[in-house]
Amino acid sequence: MIKVLSMMKRKEDLSLDQFRHWLTQEHVKFARQIPGLLRFVVNIPETDSPDNPFDAVNELYFDDEAAMQNAFSSEAGKASGADALAHISARSRLITVEHRLID
């Protein structure tokens, strides 16, 4: 299983509450349309702090790298990416394989 971590910084004209609403209520509609996306988890800080390097860390799960590539290159994947770029000022991605050590 592949897990993509997407670390995002919101655009400066969005409050953390506005960003949270967009991500959990609006952007998730795009995620639901992405083929092969098995799980989508959003992690948002409880409080706004200038010390936070990111305003959200999203987890996207796929069966394998081919499924991930297919998802991101699909029309739904491109639409999701465009929606994200309209609301964020920066994004970093890390493609990982999860190793659960304690459950």
Where are these regions (language model features)?
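Macromolecular interaction modules
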Residues: M1-D103
